[in-house]
């Protein structure tokens, strides 16, 4: 069974979000199950030179894009037993950021065409083409509409994964007409047309044999207007080929027993070492070293989606408790400024790191007691899974993957691995935070809760089995 992942980003090459983590970890887990996965992505100039040096030029071809042929170098390399192909074209990929350019429609039209034009030259017979998010959605659409009559492509099945429905790849009609050479028959509401523009993600949904969302709850949510980003009707129409498979975490990266970034390695049987990480975190940020004061942390993009309006509304009320708070992330200036002001107002209780620091993030996960993630929506979420693996108890809103992975603690049965609230309401969140703090001070209960969190399986194994079953079903 041969699978080709078409992605716009992938760890360890380049990362802007969770898509890169999925693309980096899932193929390795599938390989353990006997599934051969190769990955194709752009050769961005942002990729570390050391990784590019590990690739060799496999072939040079031309990619037809509108009225012209564009250069396409196919670089080939291997990392952790997985084969990668990098699509080389400096005109499109020598940029200072992955996305957000005026010609993104052209860049990813080129990449979509390049993926398909490369397939006969890969020395790899593709059984299933698995595309991800808007950037590669048109790979599946073009395969069905323009390539599948060719014997080299006719057997290929397609899977399309929605990581975040909010970003759809909406561009002027000229992208469709001039670059992809698709005619008027594709510019209507049953095809690519979307409020007078062209929607790449819509193409992926329409044309793919199977669609997955990154959690079962998110799969249901996106079929409703509130979460559906104007594609809810289309997703209801194609509900029969839509499924939800929750993401995992790469346990070779996120594992407190082996993590080289943290001060003291530990497991569920050596939680005193977790306290050593807490003290190290307090020292790093210059917080008073109080063992019995819970540290509440957030490692997040500072955006509206992450529920920061709730946090902002009741933050001072949380500060009335005996707590310390650490925020690590960057994003919208209004939230950055708010947290910086709170750090100024509460210097003994609040510390903020604007930006991202991988090593520090690991230490925050290891050294905190509670992890706050009150998202407005969350397709899957990685932070709560990492927090659970490190015995840092998540406080989440019941949406998307947060609902699928965090079970609220039940004091009657002792079951659960975190705390959650349903409504997007600041005082519901506050009540849940206060409830978590209360249980934190009940040491036998808290220790049991931490052990329950740490002993669950958050690896990619279950997800990989579900994807293998999906691929197998397509090939039967």
UniProtKB/Swiss-Prot annotation:
A biological process term (GO) from this entry: glycogen biosynthetic process
Q: Which pathway features in its UniProt record?
A: Glycan biosynthesis; glycogen biosynthesis
Top-rank lineage group of the source organism: Bacteria
Q: Which CDD domains match?
A: GT5_Glycogen_synthase_DULL1-like
> What are the protein's UniProt keywords?
Glycogen biosynthesis, Glycosyltransferase, Transferase
Under which EC number(s) is this enzyme classified?
Answer: 2.4.1.21
Q: Which PANTHER family match?
A: ALPHA AMYLASE DOMAIN-CONTAINING PROTEIN, GRANULE-BOUND STARCH SYNTHASE 1, CHLOROPLASTIC/AMYLOPLASTIC
Family (UniProt) = Belongs to the glycosyltransferase 1 family. Bacterial/plant glycogen synthase subfamily.
The job of this chain, per UniProt, is described as: Synthesizes alpha-1,4-glucan chains using ADP-glucose.
Q: What is this protein's name?
A: Glycogen synthase
Q: Which organism is it from?
A: Bacillus cereus (strain ZK / E33L)
């Amino acid at each position: 069974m041969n699978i080709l992942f078409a992605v716009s980003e992938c760890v360890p090459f380049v990362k802007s979000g969770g898509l890169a983590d999925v693309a980096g970890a899932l193929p390795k887990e599938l390989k353990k199950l006997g599934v051969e996965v190769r990955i194709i992505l752009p050769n961005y100039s942002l990729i570390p030179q050391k990784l590019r040096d590990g690739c060799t030029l496999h072939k040079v071809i031309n990619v037809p894009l509108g009225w012209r042929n564009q250069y396409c170098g196919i670089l080939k390399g291997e990392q952790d037993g997985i084969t990668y192909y990098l699509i080389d074209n400096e005109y499109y990929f020598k940029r200072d950021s992955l996305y957000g350019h005026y010609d993104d429609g052209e860049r990813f039209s080129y990449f979509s065409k390049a993926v398909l034009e490369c397939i006969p030259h890969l020395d790899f017979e593709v059984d299933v083409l698995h595309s991800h998010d808007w950037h590669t959605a048109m790979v599946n659409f073009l395969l069905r509409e323009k390539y599948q009559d060719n014997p080299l492509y006719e057997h290929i099945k397609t899977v399309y994964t929605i990581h975040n429905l909010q970003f759809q790849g909406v561009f002027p009609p000229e992208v469709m007409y001039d670059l992809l050479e698709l005619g008027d028959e594709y510019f209507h509401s049953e095809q690519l047309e979307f409020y007078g523009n062209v929607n790449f993600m819509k193409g992926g949904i329409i044309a793919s044999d199977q669609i997955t969302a990154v959690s079962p709850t998110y799969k249901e949510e996106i079929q409703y207007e509130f979460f559906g980003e104007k594609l809810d009707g289309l997703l209801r129409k194609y509900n029969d080929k839509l499924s939800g498979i929750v993401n995992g975490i790469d346990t070779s990266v996120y594992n407190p027993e082996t993590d080289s970034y943290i001060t003291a390695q530990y497991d569920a049987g050596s939680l005193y070492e977790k306290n050593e990480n807490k003290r190290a975190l307090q020292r790093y940020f210059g917080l008073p070293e109080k063992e019995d004061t819970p540290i509440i942390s957030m490692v997040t993009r500072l955006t509206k989606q992450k529920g920061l309006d709730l946090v902002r509304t009741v933050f001072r009320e949380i500060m009335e408790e005996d707590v310390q708070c650490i925020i690590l992330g960057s994003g919208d200036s209004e939230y950055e400024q708010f947290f910086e002001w709170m750090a100024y107002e509460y210097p003994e209780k609040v510390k903020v790191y604007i930006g991202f620091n991988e090593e520090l993030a690991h230490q925050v996960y290891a050294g905190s007691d509670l992890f706050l993630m009150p998202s407005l929506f969350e397709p899957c979420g990685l932070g709560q899974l990492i927090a659970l693996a490190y015995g840092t108890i998540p406080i989440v809103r019941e949406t998307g993957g947060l609902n699928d992975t965090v079970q609220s603690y039940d004091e009657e049965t002792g079951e659960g691995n975190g705390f959650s609230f349903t409504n997007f309401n600041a005082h519901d969140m506050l009540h849940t935070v206060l409830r978590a703090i209360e249980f934190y001070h009940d040491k036998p209960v808290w220790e049991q809760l931490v052990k329950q969190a740490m002993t669950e399986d958050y690896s990619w194994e279950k997800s990989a089995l579900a994807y293998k079953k999906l691929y197998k079903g397509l090939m039967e």
